[in-house]
């Protein structure tokens, strides 16, 4: 008889057998529901399937979503810690931070994290150094702000709403200020705590255009920004293609699905090849 995989490793599925004790168990934590993050999750699962890990056969998933609630997120991290999981996928910075705080003895692959170094998830981009690595959605903010001027050449000010409690969001505000200045724009900002404040924040910003970064709280309520923008007849520049379907004027975007797919490739390197997250560079 063939040997069973070692703990934390598994051979790809080649047949139609039902899930067995040899199947990998992966916990997935997605901070909130919106199309871009859904695309990351689907990309990951498709990437695993393409590598031979069919869901329900060679891998099973425990998928959790706290819908932005920090207490629920902490609880999910504790649950994952107590389970016999082979790997955790953390989608976005808050999810990765919660998982990293709770889980130190198993690999964590993140996706949709803007700057894992400044948020102290990894020691460096090239040598993470701990039990985390993954794929980053570090945004092309200069190109995004330049797009504002292309769409609205007469614009002088651009409004940006951000989650004041999320480290990634603060990083993006600083980058956006510099990029706006380079594009000949003045950035005006408004911080929020949750998605219910997005419309009020948009109404409070006197701006010739709105820029929505890949701030998950704001993106989850982008319709509120679009409503205010339409009333004022000003454009909304987004950072993800799905926001175009929801009414944004234009977008300069990172491919979220591909980010999840590539995170699966990293997971396979860890689970099938025995590589350590500490030595796998974070992918931009």
Regions found by a protein language model. Give the residues of each.
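Short hydrophobic alpha-helices and adjacent helix-cap/hinge residues
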Residues: 6-15, 19-284
